[in-house]
Amino acid sequence: MFLFAVLALATAACSRQAPAPAPAAAPDTQTSADNGPDFGAVSVDIAPPKKKAVDIGKTTEWPEAKLESGKASISCSTDYVANGDGQAFTNLGFFSLLDVMLPCKEVGVVRLRYKGRVAGDLTTLIERVASMATRMGIKQRILDIDSSGGQVEDAIRAGDVMADTNWTMWVREGAVCHSACVLLLAGGDDRVISGAVGVHRIIRIQSEATSRAQLSAELHEVHDAMKDYLERNGASVAVADFMMTVPNQSLRILTPDELQAFGLIGRNAAQQDLERIRLVRRCGLDFVRREDAFHRAFEQQCAQPGQAVDAINACGLALRPHYGFPDKKCLDDGPLAELDAQAKAAAEAAEDNGDADLPIATQ
């Protein structure tokens, strides 16, 4: 009974919203779709994945795999302006990833930069980086993506992997997340978006339909799968319906208000509900109230359309002290904790040297 009362107080605190900022000028939301080989958002007949004979979390003998649908690199820094995007790699074997990610173990953060199509090897990439991060105790994981789309079924699988392994997702300035990539946003615990996010209708490249009715029947199953996926991951099922209204040759860029309404930006609602109970127990009601207040201010003051991701992060870091963060009691659970990893490593090193002052992350 005490816990339910505590949660009720926390929910009531969240309902008191600060005044919304003045609306920004309406952006140009209509453009042409990428005419690449995947047509942006493709549905194909893919055999269900076989039950895995190897649990990659319990062995070093991973099945051979190579990244072919895009370019990936690993960085142990969130400051991409100063430090770039890290070390590139294509081999997804155990020891290859071990070598690339080992420097991130001490820092406690891994940023996976990916530029390319949404395909089956992207799912493998995310799954294996997450598995290696778990082995190394790296809790802060960022998928820094730039993708014009790919296969819907693979996007759903990759998004579910992300949801199970706690990723923050970035769409940086100059990057895009179009078509099937948009589904990945639902899988992130938190989404920081500066680049363009766009949707359009799914195309069945293996379709034998000769009428709109036949094509509609073929798309119905994948449309329902998209809705189920969006619902279980805290996004609005209206995203799937909206996609079907935009011709495949066109691209509808989502506005910040639409991203918010569809549950594709900021904190993931489903993950937030899941974490709230744990946070109240572990960090206390005051912590949860301060975190909620911070995120309301962050969304209004920092996450503005057109801002670069590094500027959004810098704004959030400057805002945190006003709400008592970082909180020494729950360093790994506070807002923008992924940006604290390097500062935390420095703090632990300082403590070993007899200086216990806690540095605050800055950019």
Q: Whereabouts are the PLM-identified features?
A:
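Small-residue-centered hinge/linker elements
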Residues: 19-20, 27-139, 148-150, 194-237, ...
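Surface-exposed patches in mature extracellular/periplasmic domains of secreted proteins
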Residues: 139-145, 170-174, 194-197, 236-246, ...
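Extracytoplasmic/secreted envelope proteins and their assembly/folding machinery
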Residues: 123-130, 155-159, 163, 181-182, ...
